[in-house]
Amino acid sequence: MGKPVVAIVGRPNVGKSTIFNRIAGERISIVEDTPGVTRDRIYSSAEWLNYDFNLIDTGGIDIGDEPFLTQIRQQAEIAMDEADVIIFMVNGREGVTSADEEVAKILYRTKKPVVLAVNKLDNTEMRANIYDFYALGFGEPYPISGTHGLGLGDLLDACAEHFKNIPETKYSDDVVQFCLIGRPNVGKSSLVNAMLGEERVIVSNVAGTTRDAVDTAFTYNQQEFVIVDTAGMRKKGKVYETTEKYSVLRALKAIDRSDVVGVVLNAEEGILEQDKRIAGYAHEAGKAVVIIVNKWDAVDKDERTMKEFEQNIREHFQFLDYAPVLFMSALTTKRIHTLMPAIIKASENHSLRVQTNVLNDVIMDAVAMNPTPTHNGSRLKIYYATQVAVKPPSFVVFVNDPELMHFSYERFLENRIRDAFGFEGTPIKIFARARK
């Protein structure tokens, strides 16, 4: 199951970003007193009562030059589409406004649970105002103060109560789940159609975790796969086409549920900043990654073009140096046959376990080749290493002092591990721990 998604909805200047930052535990959004100022990150992981969940600040979803109320409506619609639980936030100092009532009218239509949060109630006297908000029709209002962090525990308890009722879409561990992500119009749907048109592919559609998400299950060479949220790739409409951050939000949810992520680039347009941002989310989530250059048929080529394009990708995506780069055309289906083998290989490497004795031979050979660094007269000593997890493969190296493990030496060890075991298509993580 993907993590539950909680969306914070409300008119501008009710304190959505402050609460978002409080819950996320870090200052992610830009917080000012000017309406509509949220510009930065709108999506963050958070944790409460042993629940991991994703948090959205819909104020960060910029609809463009639409009228004020239209923007609020569209942000609320997106929250209703994407969230499992909605926090409807109002300003306790200003009472119920017509804009609050507009948001309430939209939220009446949703079957998703709505938790009403009355912000900016910084002391007990102010809480006398809370009863006015029962008129909005969402039951008990939760008094909170974003500035002082008051009342957030009760608010999150109320959200967590609803997490228990979220339906799970659980595939067996043998099923490889993957998604294709990328900017609008890079050809994600066309790639899916071209893949599913291959002779060896047997297709069926299954319901995803949200009411409008459809996953596509298929079998390839007797292995079962699921393409996560094929409905999201095909979603049209003004909000979805024009809102860059909406497409990122949808991609993040798909990444969360996937083992392997295909980052799709448009060969005609080259590499844009948004491509790097979207790819960065897959890397940060520790997923296996394959880079797919689509629309290769539309590019004028000579014998150097592909190599130069790949070099350009490597320069822009240095954090994805482990990801294979595939060139293909969904339109002509040329090289489409290379995609499934690459996904299978990345998935296998993402789950690969290596023997401890072989791993330690590799580590000790690496140390002999390149002695450990020193700092202030102390030298790093490596005692032994062991693999502690897969998806992604994660290793703990036991040392005398973790502070002496410089990132460049950690990178050197990673490269030696990759030389020995491959791991193409997957990130690997290395943690230094003091031997007890």
UniProtKB/Swiss-Prot annotation:
Protein name per Swiss-Prot or TrEMBL: GTPase Der
Family (UniProt): Belongs to the TRAFAC class TrmE-Era-EngA-EngB-Septin-like GTPase superfamily. EngA (Der) GTPase family.
GO molecular function, one term: ribosome binding
Gene: der
Physiological role: GTPase that plays an essential role in the late steps of ribosome biogenesis.
Xref: CDD domains: EngA1 (cd01894), EngA2 (cd01895)
Ligand binding (GTP 1): 10-17, 57-61, 119-122
All copies of domain EngA-type G, residue ranges: 4-167, 176-351
GO biological processes: ribosome biogenesis
Binding locations of GTP 2: 182-189, 229-233, 294-297
KH-like domain residues: 352-436
HAMAP family assigned: GTPase_Der
Pfam families: KH_dom-like, MMR_HSR1
Subunit and interaction comment: Associates with the 50S ribosomal subunit.
Alphabetically ordered keywords of this record: GTP-binding, Nucleotide-binding, Repeat, Ribosome biogenesis
Keyword flag Transmembrane helix: no
